[in-house]
From Swiss-Prot:
It comes from the Archaea. It is an enzyme of class 1 (oxidoreductase). The gene is hdrA. Belongs to the dihydrofolate reductase family. NADP(+) binds at residues 8, 14-20, 47-48, 67-68, 101-108. This is Dihydrofolate reductase HdrA. Gene3D superfamilies: Dihydrofolate Reductase, subunit A. Its EC number is 1.5.1.3. GO terms for biological process: dihydrofolate metabolic process; folic acid metabolic process; one-carbon metabolic process; tetrahydrofolate biosynthetic process.
């Protein structure tokens, strides 16, 4: 199964401020993001899950949480570790699971990712949440497409670092 991180980030790696995106909404980015993850399970932190309850993404939500809890959503599953999240996604017969944040979840999964799909928003923004740094030697830029308001980059972990 492939683990893929999906995020929108500014040039300074900012992904959020006070729980919101720090830049104006980019409808084309939101559309491609929702379309990409619609039919597959997503892995996200509890806070991110709670913030999206009115419009949950993905076919299932694997919510990372250290505390024992259940969710009042049939498609939500709790996981306490990367391994447990991967096992849950595999039990759902997923070929791909998308890691969609927040910052601590991105950092936790970074060493385990196969791909990153990053919407690069031009400019630097003030924020309190950042996408983790990655070792450029371990990644290859596979595709880059310019869109209005963002550039979509697809990164693949290099074969030598797997």
């Amino acid at each position: 199964m492939e683990l893929v991180s999906v995020a929108a980030l500014a040039e300074n790696r900012v992904i959020g401020r006070d729980g919101e995106l720090p830049w104006p909404s980019i409808p084309a980015d939101k559309k491609q993001y929702r379309s990409r993850i619609a039919d597959d399970p997503v892995v996200l932190g509890r806070t991110t899950f709670e913030s999206m309850r009115d419009d949950l993404p993905g076919s299932a939500q694997i919510v990372m949480s250290r505390s024992e809890r259940s969710f009042s959503v049939d498609t939500a599953h709790r996981a306490a570790s990367v391994e447990e999240a991967v096992d849950i996604a595999a039990s759902l017969d997923a070929e791909t699971a998308y890691v969609i944040g927040g910052a601590a979840i991105y950092a936790l999964f970074q060493p385990h990712l196969d791909r990153m799909v990053l919407s690069r928003v031009p400019g630097e923004y003030e924020g309190d949440t950042y996408y983790p740094e990655w070792d450029a030697a371990e990644w290859e830029l596979d595709a880059e497409t310019d869109h209005e308001g963002f550039t979509l980059q697809e990164w693949v972990r290099s074969a030598s670092s797997r």
